[in-house]
Amino acid sequence: MEEDKRWIVVPTWRVPGRMEKWHSLVKYLKYKTKDLEKVCYVPHHKVGWAWWTCSRVIFPLKGNSHLEIQAYWNLTPEKGWLSSYSVRITWYTEKFWTDVTPDCADVLIHSTYFPCFTAGEVRRAIRGEKLLSCCNYPRAHRAQVPSLQFLALVVVQQNDRPQRDSTTRKQRRRDYRRGLRLAKQDSRSHKQRSSESPTPRTYFPGVAEVLEILA
């Protein structure tokens, strides 16, 4: 007797294009800038038996928890949609796990990765001094109710330091473009040189923007 086919239904977010942009940016931030050095990137040929999985990116978080972004491909092959992609975003803790939205994923990632304003920046802004830190993950704050202190720091960062801010934005654009070009180069080996000067912190545009997720 032939066994009926069993289906496992999970919530996913559809991605309109291919996954090279996401993979290249993760590898660039992991191996080059070291912003995501602790992140585990698992390509499709190392996933194992899960042939429908394109990649797995695991973000270790604080408090013995982690966030996993798992990309799927070869969706609905019976309809010929072999070029369709989607991602599943899951948050794991010691006692439970749950699927989360891209906005929630941004908040979780920013809690561990990419620097933000330090506690002393408010006092520096009140005294009219230059800010010594900035937020490199502004997308993570869109899902939250911002405090007056945070809004004030954003305004100071944008208006009070035009020359430095312009340089920072140019550096962010260069870092982002370099990360995206890694997909075309298909570079799988990354050399780590201790004699090189540390690379400046990289701006991260957000999970939904990089993946171009269709809500």
From Swiss-Prot:
Disordered: annotated span: 161-203
Keyword vocabulary terms for this entry: AIDS, Host cell membrane, Host cytoplasm, Host membrane, Host-virus interaction, Membrane, Phosphoprotein, Ubl conjugation, Ubl conjugation pathway, Virion
Multimerization: region residues: 154-167
Biased amino acid composition, Basic residues: 169-181
Motif segment (BC-box-like motif): 147-156
Biological process annotations from GO: viral life cycle
Membrane topology: Peripheral membrane protein
Superkingdom, natural source: Viruses
Membrane-traversing stretches: none
UniProt-listed Pfam families: Vif
Chain positions with Phosphothreonine modification: 98
PTM statement from Swiss-Prot or TrEMBL: Processed in virion by the viral protease.
Residues the record lists as Phosphoserine modifications: 147
GO cellular component: host cell cytoplasm; host cell plasma membrane; membrane; virion component
Disulfide bonds: none
Location in the cell: Host cytoplasm; Host cell membrane; Virion
Residues spanned by motif HCCH motif: 110-141
UniProt induction comment: Expressed late during infection in a Rev-dependent manner.
Keyword Membrane: yes
Remarks, miscellaneous: Required for replication in 'nonpermissive' cells, including primary T-cells, macrophages and certain T-cell lines, but is dispensable for replication in 'permissive' cell lines, such as 293T cells. In nonpermissive cells, Vif-defective viruses can produce virions, but they fail to complete reverse transcription and cannot successfully infect new cells. Vif-defective viruses show catastrophic failure in reverse transcription due to APOBEC-induced mutations that initiate a DNA base repair pathway and compromise the structural integrity of the ssDNA. In the absence of Vif, the virion is morphologically abnormal.
Record family assignment: Belongs to the primate lentivirus group Vif protein family.
Record remark: domains: The BC-like-box motif mediates the interaction with elongin BC complex. The HCCH motif (H-x(5)-C-x(18)-C-x(5)-H) mediates the interaction with CUL5.
Its biological purpose: Counteracts the innate antiviral activity of APOBEC3G. Forms a complex with host APOBEC3G thus preventing the entry of this lethally hypermutating enzyme into progeny virions. Functions as an adapter molecule, recruiting APOBEC3G to the ubiquitin-proteasome machinery. Targets APOBEC3G for degradation through the assembly with elongin BC complex, CUL5 and RBX1. Binds viral RNA and affects the stability of viral nucleoprotein core. May play a role in viral morphology.
Assembly behavior: Homomultimer; in vitro and presumably in vivo. Interacts with viral Pr55Gag precursor and human APOBEC3G. The interaction between Vif and APOBEC3G is species-specific, which may play a role in restricting the replication of HIV to humans. Forms an E3 ligase complex by interacting with human CUL5 and elongin BC complex (ELOB and ELOC).
Name of protein: Virion infectivity factor
Organism: Human immunodeficiency virus type 2 subtype A (isolate ROD)
